[in-house]
Amino acid sequence: MNPLKKAYCRVFQNVFKFALPLLPYRNPKIIGSVKGITEVLEKRNYNNVLIITDAGIRSLGLTERLEQTLKRSCISYHIYDKTVANPTTVNVDEALHMYLDNDCQAIIGFGGGSSMDCAKATAARIAKPHQSLAQMKGILKIHKKLPLLIAIPTTAGTGSETTLAAVITDAETRHKYAINDFPLIPRYAVLDPKVTLSLPPFITATTGMDALTHAVEAYIGNSTTPGTRKNALDAVRLIFENLDTAYTDGNNIEARRNMLRASYFAGCAFTKSYVGYVHAIAHSLGGKYNVPHGLANAVILPMVLETYGDSITHKLRNLAVTAGLCDKHEDDKTAARMFIDAVKDMKKRFGIGDYIPEIQETDIPELAHYADKEANPLYPVPVLMDASELETLYYRLMPPAGNC
């Protein structure tokens, strides 16, 4: 990256860092069970809600407990279940019309990050009906109170139940972009491990590594606070202690509960301290090829950590100690290597490879352009890279010839 752009990025990031204490961040209030939702709705005299989820979640019967809970309290509900893996502007438009046509009063995002992103974006369109989502992309462009938004994560990974972001894909261009503003933070997050028990092992693994990526990128960035560092470390500890158990024994409710806590802590960490190039690259791949976000993060994370090199060895040492990989007396370089190797070993145990076979060489300049545009100047990464430097990372993610 040229010196002028680098200086601009760092000034921009420092302004946001020093503004952190003045910004209206808030954490969602935690509800420990789906059954607790009715009390929240009844206090507001709400009796008609929209549930935004996806067909897979619905077919597994995961929404049934919520539906029965609402029925017992005489609360009407309507379900939008067409959300796709990388939610599109079409999904949001359809959910918006369902909300308005049925005079709903609140939105419940039920599912993984995609359902919650769709729910957030739908709420934004309700608050600003005369603006398109494209006009809201970027930072602090909503400025309005949203309908009551409740998030029920069925995966322990995205952290979307805590964040001020909604990531949406333009249905026509396939460009994936983020909308970031404080009203998008859900008012309530329901951390109910019972809704995660049916999650298949591979999705448990990829979403768990998504949470790990959130925590790691938040921790190694340049805009941390004591609070975000603590949240990130707590998330890393819980993930290393519980993800393997949740993967091999999906009915272990304590492991599931701890993974939900890890995802929540990681979400709180990166909401204030941001993510980095792992996410920027993963978003470009999700938008272009529908590569699942957690899977992309798991593949990309160790490569980017190695690319940052010596700039993050001390921070990776702290993560290695927290993960139980070494004691505090280990030297920085050795401990950093231990942490990166542990991430590689983890994804290998879960059957996650080293490459993204969907990448087409002719697409790389476009992909790198989108990653550069997303990350710079916003993300306070340890080492700045421009589009041309990011291109080299995409090439490294392509399978070697004859190994597709």
What are these regions (language model features)?
Residues 1-79, 400-404:
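An N-terminal, well-structured beta->alpha segment
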Residues 2-8, 316, 326-404:
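C-terminal charged capping/lid subdomain of soluble metabolic enzymes
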Residues 50, 58-130, 245-256:
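N-terminal small/polar loop signature for handling phosphorylated ligands or for N-terminal nucleophile
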Residues 90-194:
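Glycine/threonine-rich beta-strand-loop-alpha-helix active-site module
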Residues 165-273:
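Carboxylate- and glycine-rich phosphate/diphosphate-binding segment that chelates Mg2+/Mn2+
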Residues 222-231, 246-258, 273-278, 330-336, ...:
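Flexible, glycine/charged-enriched surface loops at secondary-structure junctions
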Residues 273-338, 344:
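C-terminal catalytic subdomain
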